[in-house]
Amino acid sequence: MTATEVKAKILSLLDEVAQGEEIEITKHGRTVARLVAATGPHALKGRFSGVAMAAADDDELFTTGVSWNVS
C-alpha cells in the first residue's frame, strides 16, 4: 500500500491492524514501514490505571519519622 493510500484510509487501516492484519507501506516502490498492532510494555501503558491501590497514603510511604527544623 502506498503512503498516499495510507493517508486516505488511516482510520480503517487502524481497525484492520487491531484485528491482527499487518500492513506494508511503500514509497516510490520501496517498503518504508509496516503498520502492526502494538505489543510489549508500551502497549499496556495506562491500561491498568485505577486497578491497583496503595495500602498507605503518600505521607505514610515517604515519611522518615524524623522532624526537620529548617530555619
Swiss-Prot record:
It comes from the Bacteria. One of its GO terms (biological process) is positive regulation of translation. Transmembrane segments: none annotated. InterPro entries: Antitoxin_Phd/YefM, phD-YefM_TA_antitoxins, YefM-like_sf. Belongs to the phD/YefM antitoxin family. Antitoxin component of a type II toxin-antitoxin (TA) system. Upon expression in M.smegmatis neutralizes the effect of cognate toxin VapC22. This is Antitoxin VapB22. It comes from Mycobacterium tuberculosis (strain ATCC 25618 / H37Rv). The gene is vapB22.
